[in-house]
Amino acid sequence: MAPFLVLFLAGVVAASRGDREPVYRDCVTLCERNNCTGSRLTDFRAEQPLYMRVTGWTCLDDCRYQCMWYTVSLYLKEGHEVPQFHGKWPFSRFLFFQEPASALASFLNGVASLLMLLRYRSSVPSSCQMYRTCLAFSMVSVNAWFWSTIFHTRDTALTEKMDYFCASSVILHSIYLCCMRTFGLQYPSIANGFGAFLVLLFACHVSYLTLGRFDYSYNMAANTGFGVLNLMWWLAWCFRRRFHQPYLWKCVLVVISLQSLALLELLDFPPVMWILDAHALWHFSTVPLHFLFYSFLKDDSLYLLKINHDDIPKLD
């Protein structure tokens, strides 16, 4: 299932009100001095659960987490709104999961995508013209949701970039999928050339964001452009073919639903019970759309097989 919209990519992780607070900064400095040096650091590591060490939680990370909640408690006590820290709302950590609800939602999306990949393989013969393209798209989608799960489990510079880049790869691959379906079957050389262009575009996109400081504004603008192209291309093709292929309503519904559900991102409220925020709700709401989109891919692939079979001359 392709994320036709890219609003979820537009997270500006800059300094926020919470981490600019002198109370927060002084707390982190004091905590690090008292707990993260010498024998006290050794004691911290000895007492730290194995699952926290394995997932890379450091003494400084723990100080920031504890000081975040200390600052939040002061804000609430004085009647102020909950602040964000480093571009994010404060989340209650569960085991080593930094954002438990979003991590679970991403995992469920990945499982749904994987199940639909397996169902597509079992339902569509490999002789279908779109078989390999659909499988490749499915694997790219599963990979993207894998990294989304990792990112929401443990937010680091690496996992953040992998989340963004893999999400971009799904959108670009969806554009290629649409290109193959609209005219690539008739003109494979054009589709191959366009595919090579998309690979080069993706490589340039990743290089620009990797070699220098991560440009969140550019990333948002670029992916929004990719998403709009993807959206309009699919809708235009579905509209043109609506009387020939009745199952196209599934693709249209997925596109429109993703547009509508993405509005959840605009709510941007503090997490309910410090776990469930608008981003997690959006991820949870997209899980059923995988089944509908892969149903469309299956129906369309079987349709192609049927018309190709009907075009084969019959021998008496």
From Swiss-Prot:
Q: Which residues are glycosylated?
A: N35
The signal peptide, as residue positions, is 1-18
Residue ranges annotated as coiled coil are none
> Could you say which enzyme class this protein belongs to?
hydrolase
GO MF, one annotated term: hydrolase activity, acting on ester bonds
Q: Which terms are listed as keywords in the entry?
A: Glycoprotein, Golgi apparatus, GPI-anchor biosynthesis, Hydrolase, Membrane, Signal, Transmembrane, Transmembrane helix
Q: Which GO terms describe its biological process?
A: GPI anchor biosynthetic process; GPI anchor metabolic process
EC number in record: 3.1.1.-
Q: Which residues cross the membrane?
A: 94-114, 133-153, 164-180, 183-203, 219-239, 252-272, 274-293
Q: Key word rRNA-binding present in the record?
A: no
Q: How does it sit in the membrane?
A: Multi-pass membrane protein
| Compartment(s) where it occurs, according to its Swiss-Prot or TrEMBL record | Golgi apparatus membrane
Which cysteines pair up through disulfides? They are none
Residue ranges in the Cytoplasmic topological domain are 115-132, 181-182, 240-251, 294-316
Q: What is its main location?
A: Golgi
Lumenal side: which ranges? 19-93, 154-163, 204-218, 273
Pfam families given in the database record: Per1 (PF04080)
Q: Name one GO cellular component term.
A: Golgi membrane
Please explain the role this protein plays, according to its UniProt record.
Answer: Involved in the fatty acid remodeling steps of GPI-anchor maturation where the unsaturated acyl chain at sn-2 of inositol phosphate is replaced by a saturated stearoyl chain. May catalyze the first step of the fatty acid remodeling, by removing the unsaturated acyl chain at sn-2 of inositol phosphate, generating a lyso-GPI intermediate. The fatty acid remodeling steps is critical for the integration of GPI-APs into lipid rafts.
Q: Of which family is this protein a member?
A: Belongs to the PGAP3 family.
Note the PANTHER family from the entry.
Answer: PER1-RELATED, POST-GPI ATTACHMENT TO PROTEINS FACTOR 3
Q: What is this protein called?
A: GPI-specific phospholipase A2-like PGAP3
Q: Which organism is it from?
A: Xenopus tropicalis
